[in-house]
């Protein structure tokens, strides 16, 4: 079999695993999944996005990176949050801290799926502060574009394909 055929079969099997609920390492936090074979962290926060929620997820990411032994790419789906309770100063501080924390790490990608202009405002701040660092931050209005950028099959980030919509 050619490498292309094997890759297509593996991709289809991985997508089928996602749809069936297997092949996913769920975290104890709601809305978090880690796909170890793709080195991909997926977070779908719900409710009001606030400082406590972000601080908690950062700690969760650090713990997972320590366990796995290296950084991994991230996908954050902000399309289902109810509201945002954040301030510019906090977002700037978090972005600067994350930038400095990853200064001597290999590059990683962090994709944000955003559907509102209010949410986009905060992601733009985060991306601007992280620019020219190992943290490559991009904002997307389409999940397909995010999956392409992250180089993962769409089934791993599209919640409607996972039956969680």
Regions found by a protein language model. Give the residues of each.
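Amphipathic, Lys/Arg-enriched alpha-helical "gate/interface" segment within cytosolic domains
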Residues: 2-165
């Amino acid at each position: 079999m050619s490498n292309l055929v094997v890759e297509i079969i593996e991709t289809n099997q991985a997508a089928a695993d996602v749809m069936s609920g297997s092949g996913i390492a769920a975290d104890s936090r709601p809305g978090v999944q880690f796909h170890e074979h793709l080195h991909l962290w997926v977070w779908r926060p719900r409710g009001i996005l606030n400082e406590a929620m972000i601080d908690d997820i950062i700690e969760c990411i650090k713990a997972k990176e320590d366990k796995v032994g290296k950084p991994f790419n991230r996908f954050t789906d902000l399309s289902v949050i109810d509201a945002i309770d954040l301030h510019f100063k906090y977002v700037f501080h978090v972005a600067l801290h994350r930038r400095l924390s990853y200064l001597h790490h290999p590059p990683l990608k962090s994709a944000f799926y955003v559907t509102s202009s209010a949410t986009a405002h905060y992601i733009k701040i985060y991306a601007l502060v992280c620019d020219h660092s190992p943290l490559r931050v991009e904002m997307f209005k389409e999940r397909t574009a995010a999956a392409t950028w992250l180089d993962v099959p769409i089934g791993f980030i599209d919640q409607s394909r996972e039956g969680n919509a």
